[in-house]
Amino acid sequence: MVVKVGVLKMGAIGTALLVEYLLDERADREDIEVRVVTSGAKMQPEEAVVAEKLKEFDPDVVIVVSPNAALPGPKAAREAFEGKPVIVISDAPAKKAKDELKEKGFGYILINADSMIGARREFLDPTEMALFNADVVKVLAATGAFRLVQEAIDKVIEDIKAGKQPELPQIVVTAEKAVEAGKFSNPYAKAKAMAAFYIAEKVADIDVKGCFIEKDPEKYIPLVASAHEMMRIAAILADQAREIEKSNDTVFRNPHAKDGKILGKTQLMAKPE
C-alpha cells in the first residue's frame, strides 16, 4: 500500500522547513506519496483555505505544522480535516491547546525548543530570519528532536499500511526526550545536546518579552538580539555534541529502506540493518 501523506504549513517554525524530507531523505521510498501546501508566512483564519487544495489529494494522514497551534488559523486548518488522522506539529505556546487536541482526537508533537523568532522590524531582516532558522534546524537535528518527529510520523504510516486505526502521537518534546531519540553514546555529547535544547527553549521567553511586552525600542531591540545570540550558541553546542560522537565513530543513523522500514547503524562504515 502507498500511504498518501498531506502536509499543511501555516507560518514558520524550524520543523516546518524540513518535515516532509525527514520522511524520505533520499527520495526513494516507494510506500508513501507526499503533497505539501502552505499559506506562506501568514496564518490568519482566512489562510486556512489552502486546506481545500490539500483535500483534492485525499490524504490518508495529514500533518499540520505551524507556530502556536492554539491560534484560530491553525485551528481552522486542522479542523478542515476532522475525521482523518491529523498530527499537529507546533511549538511550546501550543501546549495551551493540548486538552482540546486530545478531546477532538488530533495527534500532536509540540517541540519546546522550536522557539519563536525575534520579529522586530528594527532587527529582523530576511538574512537574520534565515540565519536564525538555520540555527534552529541544527539544534533540532543534532539533539534528536527531528528523529523523534520522524519516528512518530513513521509509526502512524506503518499503522495505516497495516490496515490498523493509527495511534496518533501525543508528545511534548523536552530536552530529555530529544536526547533519548538522539541515542548519544558519550555522556558529554549528551550533556552538550541537552544544554543546546535548554538554551533554545529559553529563546522563546526572551523573544516573547521583546516582541509583545516591552514597548521601548531601547529595551526590546537588545532583547531580541540576545535571544538570537542564544540560539546561535545553542547551535554551536549541538554541533559539538555531534562532533564528539563522530570522533568516537558512534553517530547513530536511521535511514529509510525503499519499503519505508527504518534501518539503523552506528559505525560509519557499517551497513544499515
From Swiss-Prot:
It is an enzyme of class 1 (oxidoreductase). Gene3D superfamilies: 6.10.140.120, F420-dependent methylenetetrahydromethanopterin dehydrogenase (MTD). It catalyses: 5,10-methylenetetrahydromethanopterin + oxidized coenzyme F420-(gamma-L-Glu)(n) + 2 H(+) = 5,10-methenyl-5,6,7,8-tetrahydromethanopterin + reduced coenzyme F420-(gamma-L-Glu)(n). Pathway: Metabolic intermediate metabolism; lactate oxidation. Optimum temperature is 70 degrees Celsius. Thermostable up to 90 degrees Celsius, however, only in the presence of salts. Pfam families: MTD (PF01993). It comes from the Archaea. Its EC number is 1.5.98.1. Belongs to the MTD family. Catalyzes the oxidation of methylene-H(4)MPT to methenyl-H(4)MPT(+). This is F420-dependent methylenetetrahydromethanopterin dehydrogenase. It comes from Archaeoglobus fulgidus (strain ATCC 49558 / DSM 4304 / JCM 9628 / NBRC 100126 / VC-16).
